[in-house]
Amino acid sequence: MAQKINPLGFRLGVTQNDRSHWFAQQRNYSKDLREDQKIRTCIENYVRTHIKSSSNYGGIARVEIRRKIDLIQVKIYIGFPNLLLIEGRGQGIEKLRNDVLNMLDSADRKLHIAIEKVAKPYRKPNILAEYIALQLEKRVPFRKTMKKAIELAEREEVEGIQIQIAGRLDGKEIARVEWDRGGRVPLQTIRARIDYCYYPVQTIYGVLGIKIWILEE
């Protein structure tokens, strides 16, 4: 039988890089790892709560974290950074920084947050998954949503994209899995620059699971 594996971990060190860059002593490793997860969750929740737009949730592609002795450097790769500055939200980054600092266990460390714009947002599966989730929450038919998402990705000149949605689609009583693909997506080729994300979305019919694979070459 085939063995399923996370496409990012499968290619780590070949075409994918780590998103946390630091070293820690053995007794502190698990603590720092949990702290990284808390930082990412805090950032994602802040963006979804404060800068949700009509077409996306702000578009976070990924969050990279670097640590020094008393400094934590966070770089947020975001598809639509202007949403942090419009509608009187000029202090959005500073408020986000304060929220993260309040969440951290130690108050004597410094935190630096940098924002970097993603040139082609819909080449990133996380941003595309947020778009799909928003459409499903609005009860847009899932097939129409998948085709539109593939069109958005193809406009960004991706080599291939595969989308899978699982759950009670269109409110049907029996859960099922549906997928669509555009271009080629060689999942078993380690050298293929495939980006991937899994994104759950809560609907009135239950939780739907969205999986997206994008070949960036």
Swiss-Prot record:
Q: Indicate the quaternary assembly.
A: Part of the 30S ribosomal subunit.
Q: Which NCBIfam families match?
A: rpsC_bact
Q: Which organism is it from?
A: Pinus koraiensis
Q: What's an example Gene Ontology biological process for this entry?
A: translation
The answer to whether UniProt assigns keyword Plastid to this entry is yes
Tell me which family the UniProt entry assigns to this protein: Belongs to the universal ribosomal protein uS3 family.
Ordered alphabetically, the record's keywords are:
Chloroplast, Plastid, Ribonucleoprotein, Ribosomal protein, RNA-binding, rRNA-binding
The KH type-2 domain extends over 47-119
Q: Does the keyword Chloroplast apply?
A: yes
Main subcellular location:
plastid
User: What's one Pfam family here?
Assistant: Ribosomal_S3_C
In Swiss-Prot or TrEMBL terms, this protein is called Small ribosomal subunit protein uS3c
Q: Which GO terms describe its molecular function?
A: rRNA binding; structural constituent of ribosome
State its location(s).
Answer: Plastid, Chloroplast
Disulphide connectivity of cysteines: none
Q: Which GO terms describe its cellular component?
A: chloroplast; cytosolic small ribosomal subunit
Identify the CDD domains for this entry.
Answer: KH-II_30S_S3
In terms of PROSITE patterns, this protein maps to: KH_TYPE_2, RIBOSOMAL_S3
